[in-house]
A protein has these predicted regions:
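Short catalytic-loop micro-motif centered on adjacent basic/acidic residues
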Residues: 63, 85-88
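Surface-exposed, flexible loop/turn segments at secondary-structure boundaries
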Residues: 20, 69, 83, 93, ...
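Catalytic cores of nucleic-acid endonucleases
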Residues: 90-131
Length: 158
């Protein structure tokens, strides 16, 4: 992924999501603490939280945004055989961009994707869904998943 890396195009994340919350205005902080209302910050908070967990597992953070398009992925990770888009959904989104990336002939290295949301663990249309709190288990899933899939389908069919 480093070969396509553009050092002048990047996203910034806090190493500690608590620091991100501390930068909110006082009213938003109080609303968040008292009412658990994440409001307009929900997407940024969850994306930062997942990014923080990915870094702690040793992943480098890469994202994708196609020019003049809404096609994007919050993060990308790599396994031995595949490039995996990782989406973070603040709401119960359908991960339209991820489905496009998985099914498009333009991206042959993308065979499946991972979505983090408030939903339970699930699998549909080559998208594996996990609750946010399972982010810290991603590396373990990836190691077990790749070995299982390779045994079942063979390296070329992943």
């Amino acid at each position: 992924m480093g070969g396509n890396y553009e050092p002048d195009t990047f996203k910034l994340y806090f190493a500690d999501t608590g620091l991100l919350v501390s930068m909110l205005d006082d009213e938003s902080q109080e609303d968040l603490r008292a009412n658990k209302n994440l409001g307009v910050y929900k997407g940024a908070l969850y994306e930062n939280m997942v990014g923080e967990a990915l870094i702690k597992q040793g992943y480098k953070l890469f994202y994708y945004k196609k020019e003049n398009s809404t096609l994007e992925a919050d993060f990308f990770i790599r396994s031995a055989a595949s490039l995996i888009p990782v989406e973070v959904k603040a709401k119960s989104g359908r991960a339209k961009s991820m489905k496009t990336l998985i099914t498009s002939d333009h991206y042959p290295d993308i065979r499946y994707g991972i979505k983090f949301s408030k939903n339970n663990i699930g699998h549909e249309d080559r998208i594996y869904t996990f609750p946010y709190f399972c982010t810290f288990l991603l590396k373990r899933f990836m190691l077990g998943f790749h070995a299982e899939e390779e045994a079942e389908y063979g390296e070329g069919d992943l």
